[in-house]
Amino acid sequence: MAAVPNTETCTILVNDVELVVPKGELIVESVKRLGLEIPIFCYHPRMKPVGMCRMCLVEVGTKQPDGSVRKMPKPQAACTLPASEGLVIYTDTEMVHRDRRGVLEFLLINHPLDCPICDRGGECPLQNNTLFYGPSTSRYLEIKRHLPKAYPLSQYVTLDLERCIQCGRCVRFTEEISGDHQLAFRFRGASMQPSTFKLTDFESKFSGNVIEICPVGALTSAKYRFRARPWDLETKPAQCTNCSVQCSIWFDYRSGRFVRVNGRTNEFVNEEWTCDKGKFGHDWYNSEKRLTTPL
């Protein structure tokens, strides 16, 4: 929900660089105007900010009349902080790096070492953020938690609870985007996990999108599972032909054979989402019975 409807602007300072942005714009979006990226897990620009993962912490202060900066005692979540006149932001300080390392260390305490077999490996935000911001070694020596793995939420979506970092993206998608409210969190605290009501099937026409927005490989495609690694794929832009909407999509191929569909951004048609018919209804693409020459 990064868009700001009004045209009123304000001046903020980001890493000592003055920047004019729409008033109320979230800081996580404002810094992109300077080519900066703040690491995120729970934030998604098309959904309301919740500040659940705390990965986007930045130092914040306000400019004083004498030119000095009065800093807040604790870092703030950039995904929930709106821009206002005189706001001062620091994204690259020792405190920020220390806090990001701490957040990642807590997330990795119980995260399984599944990277070599995880379908998200190679295109995983958790991998990338750990490489750039995380600790190089683990101090955790105890036995990790064990939760159900490869749990079928539906015939299309597989859930691995050990990998879940409780970012809430999947739950919020069903509430705010698809509107079917199929997923919710059950239990509380460290035991919190996404689930369907009374453990019924995840019945949604748009369930495949939660696979794409999951930042850690907790939700994976049952059809794509263990079929390829990202660096083995050839990706081409395409239009879905399963209905007249003609959603913009990405086609992924491996060794000349089709393996996966992902949504492609097109603000005028499908934003970035796909329906399950377009995402999973592609078995016939590789069928040997397809016509390859005119009749």
Predicted stretch roles:
Residues L13-V17, R254:
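Short strand-turn-strand beta-turns centered on an Asx-Gly dipeptide
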Residues L141, V259-L295:
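Cofactor-/ligand-binding subdomain signature composed of acidic, glycine-rich
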Residues A2-T11:
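Terminal leader/tail segments of proteins
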Residues F41-K48:
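Serine/threonine-rich, repeat-prone extracellular segments and beta-strand-based repeat modules
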Residues R54-T241, V245-I249, R257-F258:
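Fe-S ferredoxin-like electron-transfer domains
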Residues L34, I38-P39:
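Protein-protein interaction/assembly regions in multi-subunit complexes
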Residues E25-E29:
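Short, structural beta-strand-to-alpha-helix junction motif
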Residues M47, D201-E203, G263-V269:
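Short linker/helix segments within small regulatory modules
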